[in-house]
Structures are given as structure tokens and as C-alpha cells.
Amino acid sequence: MTIALGKFTKDENDLFDIMDDWLRRDRFVFVGWSGLLVFPCAYFALGGWFTGTTFVTSWYTHGWASSYLEGCNFLTAAVSTPANSLAHSLLLLWGPEAQGDFTRWCQLGGFWTFVALHGAFGLIGFMLRQFELARSVQLRPYNAIAFSAPIAVFVSVFLIYPLGQSGWFFAPSFGVAAIFRFILFFQGFHNWTLNPFHMMGVAGVLGAALLCAIHGATVENTLFEDGDGANTFRAFNPTQAEETYSMVTANRFWSQIFGVAFSNKRWLHFFMLFVPVTGLWMSALGVVGLALNLRAYDFVSQEIRAAEDPEFETFYTKNILLNEGIRAWMAAQDQPHENLIFPEEVLPRGNAL
């Protein structure tokens, strides 16, 4: 039996092909299909943040100033979260809360959901951009995989955590001092520094910084020279095709320092990828746990003994008292609508403060 294979011809004017050709053609700044997501989302997220920090107050949601117009500076300005009473509303401009009134939308905290959602999709689009470009030039997708770590942290902190709580109100506001305040909140209400997932995150970030410094210094130490002159390092020539540093020399150096060293570049660079990415992912998982109000380590026996014996204190019991102080102060400040009044006997006391 003979089977005839005919070549399938597509319409040369097919809209998808025209779009694909224009989006993926070689240009100074690659656009790609991912660009349809990342460019508008990044534009709106950054534009919303600059607009919010410049003009929009937090008086109606938090009871304080947060814009340059009110006297804040770069460190104290922020796009603040919506009020606690708005729960998890998307706060669309045309929604039932603002009803198309832009001024009211700003007063209710609409810029926060605007920046958070466009920012999240912008970051996801940037990861897809790396994946798309890597596929176009036949690279492995490890850049996109690595960038998934900061995306996981952003989504867990700004979206998943407040979704697990009573509203967007408990997410961080977009500002420098606002993030610091959120860190204090995490410590006071969740004892975050004693959480093992936070410990893994710190180990990953600081470990990656150490690996980066060691790696950069080692490569600089073992650069090849092409002569006796002080300024003839061929390694700084971008057109040099061959190796620019000696892995063998680096291996011998660290073998003498530590007794062990990386035997090849692939394992070395995979380790430099693995440490920060794993640390950030573990930290993101920990924040998801906090969204569900899961506890960190609780050394109850030390707390009981400290309560019974005034002379017994540990760094842990001192930190627990500090956390109580944070909660007592922040709850009343953050939720003025609750009219929280704490009697003297519930405020932190003892020799820790």
C-alpha cells in the first residue's frame, strides 16, 4: 500500500504567524509573547506605585500620612493596604466600593490591590520572558526556574498571607518603612525569627552571598595573563574565545584551604543556584504556614519555669515578652476601629523589658 504525504501549507497571512513574527523577531529589546503580559503589568505596577506614594494618603485606611504630598520621604512613603473592613475585595474602580469614583477608590486603598496584582503578574511575565527567550536561543530554562524563587516569596507574602488572614489589611504596604513595620508585625504575632522556614531562608540568602563573594574572588585570583605587563589581562577582553581562568588552580587552592573543593564547574554553579533558590522557596512555604496561623517553635517548659521563677530567664523568654509588647502596641494602633484598650496587667512585664 502506498501512502502519499503532502506538505501542509498554511495561509501566509495567518494572523497568529504575523503576530509571532513581529513579537519574536530580533531587536534591541526582545518582546515576545511574554511581553504582552510583562510590559503592561510592569508599567501599571510601577506607575501605580509612583502615583500612590506621591499623592495618595492613608488617612482613611490606617490613620496616618504616607505620601510625598503630605511630607513623607522615600523611606517613609508607601502605597498602603486597604482598610480591614474591606476584607479581600479586589477593590476594582468600577466595583461596589468605589463605584467609579477615582478619589474614593484612592481613599479606600485601591492602589494597593492595583499594584499588588499587576506586580504579581508582571513578575510571572518576566519569568515567562526568560523561559521564552531561553527556548528561542536553545538554552536551558534555569534562569526562569531561579526567578521562580523571588516570585514565590512575593506571592506568599503579599497575596497568600493576607488571603489566609481577615483581609488585605494584614499584607505589607508598598514602602520601605512599611516593609520594616510588617517585619516587626511578623515577629510579634508569629515569632517569625524562630520559625525553621525563616532560618532556611536566611541560610539560603546569606549562604548565597558568601558563595557569590568566594566564587568571584576565586575567578579573579586565577585569571590568565597574556604577558608580563600589569594591564594585559586577556580575561577582560570580551572577544577572547578560550578560557579566562584556571579551574585546576582554583581547585588546588580550596583543597588546601578546606581540604575539599568543587571538582567541576557544573556542580559548583548548580550549588550556587540551589542554595538561594531553595532558601527562598522554603521561606515562601513558611509564610504560607503563617497564613494558616501555624505555630513556630514553642518552648513552653521555659515559659512556665520563667513564670514561676523570677530569676530564670533565657533569650527565648525575653523574646516572648518582647513579642507580647509588639502585639499590645500594634493591635491598638493598627485597628483603631476596634477601640482596643489593654489593661495594665496584660502588658509585658518582668526583667526582659
Curated annotation (Swiss-Prot):
Q: How is the cofactor bound?
A: The D1/D2 heterodimer binds P680, chlorophylls that are the primary electron donor of PSII, and subsequent electron acceptors. It shares a non-heme iron and each subunit binds pheophytin, quinone, additional chlorophylls, carotenoids and lipids. There is also a Cl(-1) ion associated with D1 and D2, which is required for oxygen evolution. The PSII complex binds additional chlorophylls, carotenoids and specific lipids.
| Keywords carried by this UniProt record | Acetylation, Chlorophyll, Chloroplast, Chromophore, Electron transport, Iron, Magnesium, Membrane, Metal-binding, Oxidoreductase, Phosphoprotein, Photosynthesis, Photosystem II, Plastid, Thylakoid, Transmembrane, Transmembrane helix, Transport
Q: What residue stretch is flagged as signal peptide?
A: none
Positions of post-translational Phosphothreonine modification: 2
Record-listed E.C. numbers? 1.10.3.9
Against SUPFAM superfamilies, the record matches this protein to: Bacterial photosystem II reaction centre, L and M subunits
Which GO CC terms are listed, alphabetically?
chloroplast thylakoid membrane; photosystem II
Q: Which parts of the sequence bind a plastoquinone?
A: 215, 262
Annotated residues that bind Fe cation are located at 215, 269
Instruction: Name the Gene Ontology molecular function terms of this record.
Output: chlorophyll binding; electron transporter, transferring electrons within the cyclic electron transport pathway of photosynthesis activity; iron ion binding; oxygen evolving activity
Membrane-spanning ranges: 41-61, 125-141, 153-166, 208-228, 279-295
Instruction: List positions binding pheophytin a.
Output: 130, 143
Which reaction(s) are listed as its catalytic activity? 2 a plastoquinone + 4 hnu + 2 H2O = 2 a plastoquinol + O2
Question: Per its UniProt entry, what is the enzyme's top EC class, as one word?
Answer: oxidoreductase
Residues that coordinate or bind chlorophyll a PD2: 198
Give the main location: plastid
Q: Which CDD domains match?
A: Photosystem-II_D2 (cd09288)
Compartmental location:
Plastid, Chloroplast thylakoid membrane
Write out the residues that bind chlorophyll a ChlzD2: 118
Entry-linked InterPro entries: D1/D2, Photo_II_D1/D2_sf, Photo_RC_L/M, Photo_RC_L/M_CS, PSII_PsbD/D2
Q: Which residues carry this modification: N-acetylthreonine?
A: 2
Q: What else is known?
A: 2 of the reaction center chlorophylls (ChlD1 and ChlD2) are entirely coordinated by water.
Which family is annotated? Belongs to the reaction center PufL/M/PsbA/D family.
Q: Which HAMAP family match?
A: PSII_PsbD_D2
Q: Quaternary structure?
A: PSII is composed of 1 copy each of membrane proteins PsbA, PsbB, PsbC, PsbD, PsbE, PsbF, PsbH, PsbI, PsbJ, PsbK, PsbL, PsbM, PsbT, PsbX, PsbY, PsbZ, Psb30/Ycf12, at least 3 peripheral proteins of the oxygen-evolving complex and a large number of cofactors. It forms dimeric complexes.
- The entry's protein name is Photosystem II D2 protein
